[in-house]
Amino acid sequence: MSTDAPPADGDDTFWRERRTCFLTTFRPDGTPHLVPVGVTYDPETRIARVISDGASRKVRNIRAAHDAGAEARVAVGQAEGRRWCTLEGTAVVKDDPASVADAERRYTERYKTPRVNPNRVVIEITITRAMGTAKPSGW
């Protein structure tokens, strides 16, 4: 499918409704680390965001991949009944105030205002693949 123009039948609402998602990162030894998270997704930029404490295992896994000179490959997914979607891509950790504030705003729109965390960072995932029965527009 062309990635230039989103089809009209994408299921963007599935990524706006409140639900628990899961993020998979990989430890330095290659084993998967799967955790429940809140995810926001922007179909126009194809970027998913997860807010997190900067000392969390998921953040350390992503930073370790970059420190080793590799891309940090990750996946986020969610399901409800027979509807499901997994988004795969590459992740970076951002800690600059503008990126964190933007991610917090997006999180608040989908979930609720996050608790105060002075160590908060945002994991930004550039999506390279979408699969499932409720894929967002463009896939």
Feature-to-residue mapping (PLM):
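Active-site histidine-anchored catalytic micro-motif
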Residues: 69
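Charged, gly/pro-rich active-site loop segments
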Residues: 2-5, 81-139
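Short helix-to-loop capping/linker segments positioned immediately adjacent to catalytic or ligand/cofactor-binding
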Residues: 10, 22-26, 110-115
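Short, basic/aromatic recognition patches
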Residues: 1-22
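Short beta-strand segments
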Residues: 18-54, 73-77, 86-87
